[in-house]
């Protein structure tokens, strides 16, 4: 069937900011889809609120709108652009929910917009739990015994029929938001009320728990002629009960018999046909390990996290083909882009095993609740490819960057067996490593199976890994065993530990004896057809399929899994760097291990190596490809941390030299540079022991900021006010030592400013200066950034420009540099310098139309900025006002304090742009999920040091008609100024504030941190309760102030004469 000619313009909805449950996989899907539609000749309009994506680049669609993804804003775009059709299935749950709202409100009908791809009735049938269950019953497909509830009372009725445990799944949410497993009445009450709150339809499905069944997924495609195929089937190692996004996944499935595989395949295709899905779809099934009984768990009628994984696992570009199916093309008339000879209707075949392991944020949130269930907690994931299951698992483990390199924890020997078994009996993110530890101690596989329900097949594989460890120990230095361990994915580091050698010695031993990996191609067809895709993985076999060319090559290191502090912004920079390398005539090679991103799409670079970002794995590639040099400044801290290790092997680091990278990080050298170029910084000292830190603080004066050197995203950084807090920090948060000193700095309160610049060694250009709304002390990634600055004087701007140029030249930067300044009462100080690409590069590139990462890469190759047409200094300002607002995923992370401070907590960002600051802020706040209302109730409970400041705020909110609730201390302060406030009780008292929050009486909470055990606990409970009830909680008065400005600009003030 030819494609549709009755439509010309298509609107694509993106997925918005990165949150837990909806990460970079949608940037990848959206980018592919927009390009595919343009390839077919359609005019594409994209709307997405996330500036950190490749998808929102001007080249990807014909028109790009970076606006909040709300019904109101998308409706405005539809009225303005008059598209013929809307494609909703590529923007995750956000895109689907928007399409449903636009349909229900009549916007699509009024503007004659058709929905492409899967029909709305099918989407609703898959998403609405009641309709889905009815359809499954009609098809005779078993679903777990369940009931749909709209109230907590109905939930208790169902519980009386079936008993515990029960699984709660809210309708129309993703990442399991609001869901969970209930074992008793208290949990049932809490989870169901939460779930009803988060479900747009106020509807939850309660089902009898089938935890312990195998969880199997099929990624399927169907077109309008009813051709349907399975692209990939995957098996979760963790049984049903853990969200698939938090499970360790293997593809293809390893433990299904052919009968089971075909049975579940038939069911998946039967369901997708009955639903009438056109495009990609994900089917999740539960299989009883002891019989042929199965249940269907759910169907996602859209491109998902699993489809990104399936695309990278097979090389089959699901999103691209789904977009083409949506405009009428069929599977039997589209060529598979990987082979170029076979059609898309051929099911991919794999001659390797892939492992996916989720990346959790608990290294950032040590107090977060680690227990895993049906609500997702991972921020990202890694994937690895191997020829054996063991090899792919071990490669995935060392891609995680947790400091674990193998099936065990670094301090594993110190745990006693009872503790290890206790940890295995709970489902959490470290269970896999504790299982390895238990097998090492001789625990039987039967005992582990009874505790975890993990299939024996996988337990035997774990056992094999431990057996090889013992063999290495018994045959130290034996080449036969070295080669054998390599076949099963062991790293040099692990072998060195068992051989009683250094990692370097093992590496040399391999080189001398020619024990090197070969690289195999990912070709979708297990070498059945000729294929020439430049997509490779390493393994220890005989035939190398990666043909090395004579062209000069540049290797770019990617940024690994998405985590807090290192998000999709770094992938954005990586992709732009690759494009610049290709334009300059070099061969561009990427090494990365994140299946969700655009950079690991094989069509981006000349060669993609899907490998762990470790010294060993990267060196193996360098030894084969012999590139001109390696670029580390676009891959975040992951890549920067590899620079000196690679340089030791004689690898050339392109761009800013290793010596200068270290000068920016090393405290003493950096201070010497600042003195030389005459740029002031807050007074600071270095401490290697608690005693030294206390002496430093006495000299500098409290408050001080303390942090370890060499970290990204402000890990383990704190502001402390007295000796006791400092002692506590030095003994508990960090273990300071001469190798790992702690920095103790004067904490300056003032405006925080962020600047990104590009330098070619001679000229420094500054695309933009951003002012933060939150004062210094809040991590730059969690602050609202404003461009152009709104409150700085000409003198301050001139000083910032001068200092930036001096720093870039003083450090001899080649490429990008990011600098944070604070403007205190007595002038401008530099807070920190990062000699690499930063979180704000995509944001500034979009605003100013200066392709920063590409210019930086051209400078690295040796081009001059003046030849590209740029003059030194701050570049002309773009018209309008732009804000970058942070987005948090606290509703998915229990026990995490949401107070903003020097440690980064946000998972994503949105951009708001308009003609005034207030309008831009309104869009930024709305896009980040803060509902801005022109009237309502605000609850204020602030620490003593903030009481004076909160008075002015309360006065202004009162004048625009907000009702004020306050705790007694805050209310007494307001009463002194005749500001009316209703007093609410402290926690546990009469009329207590938690109850008021839970009852929905409050629209905004303003709460600032008070130190001291009792109050800290209370404050923590207040903040958690607000998050769990979906209410904005502002922990910085600067944010509250900005919100008040926006509210004032929307309404009229009422003052008596």
Curated annotation (Swiss-Prot):
UniProt: Mg(2+) 4 binding residues: 832, 834
Q: Which residues form a coiled coil?
A: none
Q: Does the keyword Nucleotide-binding apply?
A: yes
Per the UniProt entry, what species is this protein from, by scientific name? Staphylococcus aureus (strain NCTC 8325 / PS 47)
Put simply, this protein is called Carbamoyl phosphate synthase large chain
Q: Give the similarity note.
A: Belongs to the CarB family.
Q: Where is the ATP-grasp domain?
A: 133-327, 671-861
Q: Name one GO cellular component term.
A: cytoplasm
Q: Which gene does this sequence derive from?
A: carB
Region annotation Carboxyphosphate synthetic domain: where it falls in the sequence: 1-401
